[in-house]
């Protein structure tokens, strides 16, 4: 079995997953990732700017009336939409009927607008959605709903697309979501977008990373004109949990799609609204959003001397990560206000976070356990797509695979109890996963690997992407049914050669290009800037590369 796994990567050059050269270079203390003071970061030039005019008002409630008739063999449940609405359905189930509450439910408000009902089903079974008819007397722009299934990786979807034949300014409505506590409400906002030249522009798209195949639901603006709208009702069979179903209104005057935008004429850059409800944001130089082949960048808020970075510096540098087209920032621990400062910066710039629980060799799991509480007390789960418990713990001989597995399970339970519903993993090089997959796979939701091609002496910088791609293919055979995410990858810009793997600025450029092309959509690039402070910690830096992985200027 193991030989078959090794053979896949070896097809490229005989040693894709070869020997101990594959082991990563991190040791105790090297979890920090700080800014090298001498690393100059070029400023981005933005060709487009966006002014967002926000109209605040009460969200539209879209309930459906409970059918008056009762069938003995059926039970009636109210299924709450996880995204936009509440839908009452009749569920047919073999389970015993649910006891009817003695309280009289409050009257259901009258439906006012024919927006689609979106329901996520947490249990399999047969569900009946009753028919409803609505009469509309005024033309209104409402939030519709669209579903799409995304494979694993980084994707940009939604938004409003327009074509302009000359430089112009356009104003258009777009649909977005606003979280309030545990509820997510879809709203219509208006954006004034400056197009500097002729071309195709997508306004207000959404960029996200999904570790596994996922059905996403996102709002779309629809214009409802006067008329009669009918939801014909239907019976559906849910065959897997978390299935999402959109029940549209049809017949009569069907809602139109996204309103057409002006193509050449200029529009006013402002709209008269109360000053308290107006916000402004800037667009990146790429109107369509982040590139799909740059998933994440590692970052920790440390200065060159190892001191903690100021909050404004974190905000600026995380903004540069966003400007380079990334969708995620990976952090390694909770010290130096990482959660607060990086979290606030990611929220401001629209990035997701991959959190980390750092395990030091000197304090072990007992010293790291307090980070569980740090994370759960912070609890901004809407910003988090993955939590990595331990970075190269087995590789650094801090603990065995079995001990690490127990600690990962402990962390996952703590996060779940605090309301986190996302994924949890740990990060190790490929050789650890190949040797300990049976122990680690059961406790992770996705296989997290640190894949650094420089530490295989048989591969050049130009072959970096092919090597890592083969390694990912091998790792997909380790944890059956689970995807793989590459949590660290890159190439040093200075240091000593490791066989065919030669560090340097030009070599880093070549390697990064290869990695982006081959595995960029499932990879976190290491690291934001050079880590000059590591000279205090690197006790076994064989190739003198530990301080020289900064690569943000390569994007």
Curated annotation (Swiss-Prot):
User: Which Gene3D superfamilies does this UniProt record tie to the protein?
Assistant: Glycosidases
- Gene Ontology MF annotations: glucan endo-1,3-beta-D-glucosidase activity
Native organism: Emericella nidulans (strain FGSC A4 / ATCC 38163 / CBS 112.46 / NRRL 194 / M139) (Aspergillus nidulans)
Instruction: Kindly list the places in or outside the cell where this protein is found, as annotated in its UniProt entry.
Output: Secreted, Cell wall
Establish whether keyword Calcium is in the entry.
no
- Supply the source organism's classification: Eukaryota, Fungi, Dikarya, Ascomycota, Pezizomycotina
Return the InterPro entries for the record.
Answer: Beta-glucan_modifiers, Glycoside_hydrolase_SF
Question: Major place of localization?
Answer: secreted
Give yes or no: UniProt keyword Nucleus: no
What this protein catalyses is: Hydrolysis of terminal, non-reducing beta-D-glucosyl residues with release of beta-D-glucose
Q: What is this protein called?
A: Probable beta-glucosidase btgE
**What is the role of this chain?**
Beta-glucosidases are one of a number of cellulolytic enzymes involved in the degradation of cellulosic biomass. Catalyzes the last step releasing glucose from the inhibitory cellobiose.
What GO CC terms are in its UniProt record? cell surface; extracellular region; fungal-type cell wall
In its UniProt record, which GO terms are filed under biological process? cell wall organization; cellulose catabolic process
Record PANTHER family: FAMILY 17 GLUCOSIDASE SCW11-RELATED, GLUCAN 1,3-BETA-GLUCOSIDASE
């Amino acid at each position: 079995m193991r030989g078959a796994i090794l053979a896949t990567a070896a097809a490229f050059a005989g040693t894709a997953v070869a020997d101990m050269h594959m082991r990563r270079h991190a040791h105790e203390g090297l979890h920090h990732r700080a800014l090298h003071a001498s690393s100059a970061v070029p400023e981005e030039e933005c060709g487009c700017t966006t002014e967002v005019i926000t109209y605040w008002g009460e969200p539209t409630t879209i309930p459906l009336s409970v059918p008056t008739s009762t069938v003995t063999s059926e039970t009636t449940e109210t299924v709450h939409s996880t995204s936009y609405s509440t839908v009452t359905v009749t569920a047919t189930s073999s389970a015993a009927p649910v006891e009817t509450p003695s309280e009289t439910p409050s009257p259901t408000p009258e439906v006012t607008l024919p927006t689609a009902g979106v329901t996520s089903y947490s249990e399999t079974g047969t569900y009946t959605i009753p028919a409803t008819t609505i009469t509309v007397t005024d033309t209104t722009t409402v939030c519709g709903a669209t579903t799409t299934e995304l494979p694993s990786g980084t994707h940009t979807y939604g938004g409003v697309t327009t074509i302009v034949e000359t430089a112009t300014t356009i104003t258009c409505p777009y649909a977005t979501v606003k979280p309030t506590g545990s509820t997510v409400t879809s709203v219509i906002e208006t954006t004034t977008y400056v197009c500097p030249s002729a071309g195709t522009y997508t306004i207000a798209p959404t960029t996200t990373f999904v570790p596994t195949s996922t059905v996403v639901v996102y709002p779309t603006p629809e214009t409802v004109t006067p008329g009669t709208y009918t939801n014909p009702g239907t019976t559906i069979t849910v065959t897997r949990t978390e299935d999402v179903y959109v029940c549209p209104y049809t017949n009569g005057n069907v809602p139109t799609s996204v309103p057409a935008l002006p193509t050449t004429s200029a529009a006013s850059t402002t709209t008269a609204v109360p000053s308290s409800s107006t916000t402004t944001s800037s667009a990146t130089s790429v109107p369509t959003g982040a590139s799909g082949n740059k998933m994440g960048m590692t970052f920790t808020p440390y200065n060159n001397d190892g001191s903690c970075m100021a909050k404004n510096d974190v905000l600026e540098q995380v903004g540069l990560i966003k400007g380079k087209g990334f969708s995620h920032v990976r952090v390694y621990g909770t010290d130096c206000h990482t959660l607060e400062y990086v979290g606030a910066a990611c929220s401001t710039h629209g990035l997701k976070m991959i959190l980390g629980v750092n395990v030091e060799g000197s304090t072990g799991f007992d010293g790291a356990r307090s980070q569980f509480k740090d994370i759960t007390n912070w609890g901004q789960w809407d910003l988090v797509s993955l939590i990595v418990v331990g970075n190269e713990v087995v590789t650094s001989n801090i603990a065995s695979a079995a001990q690490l597995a127990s600690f990962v399970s402990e962390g996952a339970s703590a996060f779940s109890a605090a309301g986190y519903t996302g994924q949890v993993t740990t990060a190790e090089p490929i050789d650890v996963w190949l040797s300990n997959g049976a122990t680690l796979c059961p406790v992770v939701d996705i296989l997290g690997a640190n894949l650094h091609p420089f530490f295989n002496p048989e591969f050049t910088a130009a072959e970096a992407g092919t090597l890592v791609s083969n390694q990912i293919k091998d790792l997909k055979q380790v944890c059956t049914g689970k995807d793989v995410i590459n949590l660290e990858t890159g190439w040093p810009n200075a240091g000593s050669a490791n066989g065919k793997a030669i560090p340097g600025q030009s070599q880093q450029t070549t390697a990064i290009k290869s990695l982006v092309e081959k595995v960029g959509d499932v990879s976190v690039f290491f690291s934001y800037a050079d880590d000059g402070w590591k000279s205090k910690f690197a006790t076994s830096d064989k190739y003198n590369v530990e301080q020289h992985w900064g690569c943000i200027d390569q994007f």
